[in-house]
A protein has these predicted regions:
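N-terminal cap/leader regions of alpha/beta-hydrolase-fold enzymes
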Residues: 1-95
């Protein structure tokens, strides 16, 4: 079963994509997004891990700047620049 969930953090709630295996008890992995957010590629990777018996969770790392980023992997300069801008903001939010 695949779903989006909300996780409460100390400074607010953020979304995550979760893919669950058929078994109730399973090892878990955290799948970190690339520049493009929790997009179709990341969700597919989580789904494949669930098919292999893992619970896979992909948190939305950009939630403080722009929740729900889902950019297509492309060579389009404007999308690539947006992704780089979000990644820079993410790094700044860690300090």
């Amino acid at each position: 079963m695949n779903d989006r969930i909300a996780i409460e953090g100390h400074d607010g709630a953020f979304a995550a994509y979760i893919a669950r295996p058929k078994t109730v008890l399973a090892p878990a992995v955290v799948v970190l997004q690339e520049l493009f957010g929790v997009n179709a590629d990341i969700r597919k990777h989580c789904d494949e891990l669930a098919e292999q018996g893992y619970l896979a969770l992909a948190p939305d790392l950009y939630w403080r700047q722009e929740p729900g980023v889902d950019l297509n992997v492309t060579s389009d300069g404007s999308i690539l620049n947006s992704a780089r801008h979000l990644a820079t903001g993410f790094r700044a939010s860690l300090v």
